[in-house]
Amino acid sequence: MIPQESMLVVLVKMIDLIPGPPVGPSKRGRPVTYPEKLFLKALVIMIVKHLHKVHELLSVLNEPTYEMQQLRGLLTENERYPTRRTWERRLKGLPANLPAQIGCFGRYLVELIAPWATCGRAVAIDSTVLRSKGGVWHKKDREKGEVPHSSIDTQAHWTKSGWHGWVYGWKLHIACVVASVWIPLSAELTSANAADNEIAPALIYELPPEALFVLGDLHYNAPNVYEVCEQTGRLLVTTQYGPYPHTDPGVEVRRIFHKLRSVAIENFNEHFKGIFDGHGQVPTKGLLNTQRFALGAIFVYQLALLYRFQHRLDLNIGLKAFIKAI
């Protein structure tokens, strides 16, 4: 009996068929032997198999199973398999390119799925907090430069969440489609103290050209965000400053937009965290490793959407079970 391909193998093969961001000019020095997509394939394996260190990935790939044999073949270029040092170096550099890849993939999904065919072309922009692994670095210790416990991730930081209070960790900044399907279009991961409006331009520049309305909360009511939206031909709709209840002429329209935004982004955030165990501490330490985990999870979410669209499956209901079962 010929064994069937696992769903993980199917998803990894799909990476060869999706578009990638424009390649920059060649750098001086030794030419690149392995394409970026080879390491995207490895990233998908890491996210699905809950592997967060390079040696864990290589140990699992070395297992003598049919699935691992197939995956090793997909991670080979011109009959060459990367060395351990190459894996470490290229996977360390992968987070820098993930926002552009996610943006490119998001635009491709919008083109295929056409989520705005029957509704307004709006995007919700927001950030969600992820708790750091290990202990927390209290302000008094940080100011003294003292790290009281080795479990503390010193690259994380504090933020105050309206829902969770003070949290030590990271912020996952996301823009997603406001429609019947929640498609992540762009993403960035920073330490938790990064201001939402400072990261917003990077998210907005990656949006599909069809996106007309950008819906945000009060944190995005900032001159730099308005400027970027104006440059890119979009309309920014945010909560306004001042005491409640607001009585200006646009308040009723803003309430409608705010409701649409809340339904889209809050559902996506909860869906995403439920799939990738984001309600507890992240499984990684350090900015680069956490970027690779969180942005890699967004990429896997996009890949799962593409598979389910191609096979005429529901794009919201059943997605969590589908990814968990891979």
Predicted regions and their residues:
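DNA-recognition alpha helix
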Residues: V54-L75
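Structural motif
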Residues: K27-K37, H164-G165, P283-A294
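Major-groove recognition helix of helix-turn-helix-like DNA-binding domains
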Residues: Q70-P95
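Polybasic low-complexity intrinsically disordered regions
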Residues: K92, A96-L218, P223-V228
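Arg/Lys-rich, glycine/proline-spaced intrinsically disordered segments
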Residues: G29-R30, G242-G250, L313, I317-A325
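Basic, short loop/linker segments at the boundary and entry of helix-turn-helix/winged-helix-like folds
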Residues: I2-K49, R90
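Basic, amphipathic alpha-helical segments enriched in Lys/Arg and hydrophobic/aromatic residues
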Residues: R255-I326
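Helix-centered, glycine/charged polyanion-binding patches within enzymatic domains
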Residues: L218-T284
